[in-house]
């Protein structure tokens, strides 16, 4: 019963829904109304003008800067893109006038003007290196950063900031481009300076005036080894006048090899003389391979003060080995001058390999060896060369406590008359017995006997500590008169061969009539013979 009622109820609901849907589903037919087309075949055609002129504003804000407060104030401008531009910083406006010339106008910070700005513009401008610039273009103004000192700080292009440091080169760099005062940080050996004409800082080589009071550069006395006080009596007064302090320590000028620039054991000395002037020069220890020379180019302007006598003012150290290790060393000297016992009159001739040079610069004075040594027949090797250095201004007029130089060693051996500390004769014969012993002074009768019965000539003799030639130059056979004496080898040890004196005759040095001329010149030296 209940089931039948429920079924009947559902059928009624379905019937109601179906009836409602049928009622709302209405179809309308589209009604089309006819449209009447207008006939314009007889209407005349419009003929537009070939040129349309739109009148602009009469006021040109770019020719006459126009102050403003709002963008509306710029509607009067002929420039259509003009807006009210407020300036936060001082800016220079560059405009071309009616005369065709560029004119600059300064706009102060806080002022506003009607301007048409180009979209291509600089985004920033360092006030320490640049200034804002409005440059007139075809479309308006371009806001640019104009570099104040492009030689110091520049820009990558015209639309960039001035932030590329290029100054102070090549020996330094700019310290800080964001500083009001730009200065240089310079490399070692250079100092920052300022050119007032160009208003530009730069790096220049350091001079003495930059460090004269810097104790890290010029220490104060007591001075270390290899340095001397500025008031040293042997120093040139020129350097002393540039310092107010006399106890400043400077490099000993004799301790620097003038060719290689290397430091050596050479030392400056001053020896007082009777007349009170004194002798100034360099002492060059022979044991350290130093050779005393006189540099005439720095005689007046060098650090060594000139004295009343010409003395060695530099020490050379040409070899990186001891001179005894060299292939050949010859000491050639002349004995005829009146001051022979005080000053050397000598040259030294070396045969050395290029690998034995202490510095590359010494190659310039090492010449190719064209002949073998006069006393030794040997093959000349490829890398062997000859070097000649004058030691003529070495002196014994200095403190005996100083390390011995070449000439002092020579004088020590020259004064010896007993083996092994002496020089031996390598030419002539002055006595019949023990003629090869140390060079000594013999009586005239002994010399006559030796020359007569041995058919030889007496050559080497002495007068006190001074070795001389026995006879005048004109007495010897033509071409046999000694013009110089030489020691083969180096007399640092007592080897007989290294301490034997040989003669360089007039015939060895020249020929023909020049032999007679040279002989006459030798006759003019009072100390030539005993």
Curated annotation (Swiss-Prot):
The keyword Signal applies. It is found in: Virion membrane. InterPro entries: PIR. Coiled coil: none annotated. Per os infectivity factor that mediates the specific binding of occluded virions (ODV) to the host midgut target cells. Forms the PIF complex together with PIF2 and PIF3. The complex also interacts with per os infectivity factor PIF0. This is Per os infectivity factor 1. It comes from Autographa californica nuclear polyhedrosis virus (AcMNPV).
């Amino acid at each position: 019963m209940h089931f039948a009622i429920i079924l009947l109820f559902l059928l009624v609901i379905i019937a109601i829904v179906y009836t409602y849907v049928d009622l709302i589903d209405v179809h309308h037919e589209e009604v089309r109304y006819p449209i009447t087309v207008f006939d314009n075949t007889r209407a005349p055609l419009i003929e537009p003008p070939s040129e349309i002129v739109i009148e602009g504003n009469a006021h040109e804000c770019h020719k006459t800067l126009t102050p403003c407060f709002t963008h509306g104030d710029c509607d009067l401008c002929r420039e259509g893109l003009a807006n009210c531009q407020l300036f936060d910083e001082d800016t220079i406006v560059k405009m071309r006038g009616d005369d065709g010339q560029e004119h600059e106008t300064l706009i102060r910070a806080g002022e506003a003007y009607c301007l048409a700005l180009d979209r291509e513009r600089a985004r920033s401008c360092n006030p320490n290196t640049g200034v804002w610039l409005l440059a007139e273009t075809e479309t308006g103004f371009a806001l640019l950063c104009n570099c104040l000192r492009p030689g110091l700080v520049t820009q990558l292009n015209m639309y960039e900031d001035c932030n590329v440091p290029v100054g102070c080169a090549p020996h330094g760099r700019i310290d800080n481009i964001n500083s009001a005062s730009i200065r240089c940080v310079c490399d070692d050996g250079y100092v920052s300076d300022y050119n007032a004409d160009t208003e530009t800082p730069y790096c220049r080589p350091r001079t003495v005036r930059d460090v004269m009071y810097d104790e890290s550069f010029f220490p104060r006395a007591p001075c270390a080894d290899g340095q001397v006080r500025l008031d040293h009596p042997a120093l040139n007064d020129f350097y002393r006048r540039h310092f107010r302090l006399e106890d400043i320590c400077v490099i000993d000028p004799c301790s620097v090899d003038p060719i290689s620039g290397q430091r050596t054991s050479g030392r400056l000395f001053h020896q007082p003389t009777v007349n009170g002037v004194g002798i100034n020069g360099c002492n060059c220890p022979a044991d350290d391979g130093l050779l005393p020379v006189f540099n005439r180019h720095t005689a007046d302007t060098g650090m060594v003060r000139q004295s009343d006598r010409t003395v060695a003012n530099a020490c050379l150290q040409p070899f990186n080995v001891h001179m005894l290790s060299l292939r050949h060393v010859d000491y050639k000297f002349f004995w005829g001058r009146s001051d022979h016992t005080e000053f050397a009159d000598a040259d030294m001739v070396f045969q050395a390999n290029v690998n034995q040079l202490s510095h590359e610069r010494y190659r310039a004075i090492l010449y190719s060896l064209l002949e073998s040594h006069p006393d030794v027949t040997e093959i000349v090797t490829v890398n062997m060369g000859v070097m000649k250095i004058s030691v003529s201004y070495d002196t014994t007029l200095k403190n005996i406590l100083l390390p011995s130089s070449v000439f002092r060693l020579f004088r020590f051996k020259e004064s010896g008359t007993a083996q092994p500390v002496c020089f031996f004769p390598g030419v002539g014969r002055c006595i019949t017995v023990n003629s090869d012993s140390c060079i000594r002074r013999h009586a005239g009768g002994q010399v006559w006997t030796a020359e007569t019965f041995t058919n030889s000539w007496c050559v080497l003799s002495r007068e006190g500590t001074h070795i001389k030639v026995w006879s005048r130059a004109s007495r010897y056979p033509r071409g046999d008169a000694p013009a110089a004496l030489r020691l083969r080898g180096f007399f640092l040890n007592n080897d007989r061969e290294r301490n034997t004196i040989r003669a360089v005759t007039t015939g060895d040095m020249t020929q023909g009539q020049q032999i007679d001329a040279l002989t006459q010149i030798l006759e003019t030296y009072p100390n030539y013979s005993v």
